[in-house]
A protein has these predicted regions:
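Single conserved hydrophobic/aromatic residue that forms the stacking wall/gate
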Residues: 1-8
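Feature for soluble, non-membrane regions of globular proteins
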Residues: 9-188
Length: 188
């Protein structure tokens, strides 16, 4: 399913980046996690539970990156139906950020301003309020009890082959392939 989302997304993520990012980086995290979990208290648990409850360490790091990358790649479409969120998500963004443009500005600032490697997330709390967070390394907002809706990977492997040190260009281009229907369904 993830691979289908990437077909034709040449607009801002080139094939060579997909090959490394999806085919090598993500696959390594999956393989590592599959080797680490058997025989532990996390065997048989879903990714969200593992990420939310695992102590810092190898299981958490690999589970976090599998969850993060799965959410990341599934939110893309080569030709999204909408260039902005619709419905309940659009209403929540307007309520919590004033407008979609204000939200994008704040989100871009978080993604570009994150020092080092990590993720920028739009998440919802249990009351439906939206939050923008910056998560270092493989962390995810589920650790704080939030539901991740939209995530931008700002690890260098996500953009360096295409954008070199131009993280802001990478972040700006990702908006063109966001499948707002997928992101909207994550808001409960």
């Amino acid at each position: 399913e993830i691979a289908q989302c990437l077909v034709g997304s040449e607009m801002c993520i080139r094939d060579r980046t997909i090959d490394y990012h999806y085919g090598k980086h993500l696959q390594t995290y999956v393989n590592n996690l599959n080797n680490l979990v058997p025989g532990t208290e996390f065997e048989g648990k879903d990714l969200v539970t593992i990420v939310a409850t695992a102590p810092d360490g190898a299981i958490f790091n690999n589970a976090g990156q599998v969850l993060n990358h799965t959410l990341y790649f599934l939110q893309f479409a080569p030709k999204p139906a909408h260039s902005e969120p619709t419905g309940k998500l659009a209403e929540a963004i307007k309520r919590d950020f004033g407008s979609f443009e204000n939200f994008k500005k704040e989100f871009n600032a978080a993604a570009v301003g994150l020092f080092g490697s990590g993720w920028a997330w739009l998440s919802a709390d249990k009351n439906g309020k939206l939050h923008i967070t910056k998560e270092a390394n493989g962390s995810n907002p589920v650790r704080a009890g939030l539901v991740p809706l939209l995530g931008f990977d700002v690890w260098e492997h996500a953009y360096y082959l295409d954008y070199q040190n131009r993280r802001a260009d990478h972040v700006n281009e990702l908006w063109s392939i966001i499948d707002w229907d997928v992101v909207g369904k994550r808001l409960k």
